[in-house]
Amino acid sequence: MANSKQAKKRAGQSEKRRQHNASRRSMMRTLVKKVLAAIEAGDKEVATKELAAATPTLDRYASKGLIHKNKAARSKSRLNAAIKAL
């Protein structure tokens, strides 16, 4: 438990940041799942459209440090390869 005023403030800030990041991470995962669902359905046109929506989000969160830049690159690459294989 926080013993000082500064530690209490930092604990509150950390919790607020954790909730904010969890929301963003959830949104990002949902966008990726939409692409995967379109790929599973075999709908190349919808999958391409969904990937176009997910790509800037992955890049944005990689630049902000929410996910590692290599994870963003790997995700985009694998999704794109799966779409091309349709």
Curated annotation (Swiss-Prot):
This protein's UniProt keywords: Ribonucleoprotein, Ribosomal protein, RNA-binding, rRNA-binding
Tree of life domain: Bacteria
Gene Ontology MF, one: small ribosomal subunit rRNA binding
Annotated segments matching region Disordered: 1-27
GO CC annotation: cytosol; small ribosomal subunit
Pfam families the record matches: Ribosomal_S20p
GO process terms (BP): translation
Keyword Calcium: no
Record InterPro entries: Ribosomal_bS20, Ribosomal_bS20_sf
Transmembrane feature ranges: none
Family matches, as SUPFAM superfamilies: Ribosomal protein S20
UniProt entry tagged with the keyword rRNA-binding: yes
HAMAP family, per the entry: Ribosomal_bS20
Family: Belongs to the bacterial ribosomal protein bS20 family.
NCBIfam families: S20
Protein task: Binds directly to 16S ribosomal RNA.
Protein name: Small ribosomal subunit protein bS20
Naturally occurring in which organism (per UniProt): Colwellia psychrerythraea (strain 34H / ATCC BAA-681)
Gene designation: rpsT
